[in-house]
Swiss-Prot record:
Organism: Acidovorax ebreus (strain TPSY)
GO cellular component term of the entry, any: cytosol
Top-level taxon in the UniProt lineage: Bacteria
UniProt protein name: Small ribosomal subunit protein bS20
Upper classification of the organism: Bacteria, Pseudomonadati, Pseudomonadota, Betaproteobacteria, Burkholderiales
GO BP field: translation
Function: Binds directly to 16S ribosomal RNA.
HAMAP family given in the database record: Ribosomal_bS20 (MF_00500)
Gene from which this protein is expressed: rpsT
RNA-binding keyword on record: yes
Biased composition (Basic residues): 1-22
Start and end residues of each stretch annotated as Disordered: 1-26
GO molecular function: small ribosomal subunit rRNA binding; structural constituent of ribosome
Amino acid sequence: MASGKPKKKNPRLASGRKRARQGLKLNAANTSLRSKYRTAVKNVEKAVLAGDKTKATELFAKAQSVLDTIADKGIFHKNKAARDKSRLSAKVKALALAAA
């Protein structure tokens, strides 16, 4: 049996070859940013679960930056980025209120 994906034909035109090259680069960049997003969110949630208010606040600021970047580049919709920031912010604020 053949493997999962069928083999794609090579583009004939120069513009098609260029788009294929660009697609590979963009895919790698998007995958990297998506991974950075997941890591940032996980780190904030770990800090919240551990009850470390200062670390959670610090990591949340970094996560906000990553979320904004991803929304600006169009990897995630801006509403999804805003929703994720809001939910993370609520968790960090709840931790701050519980500590007070």
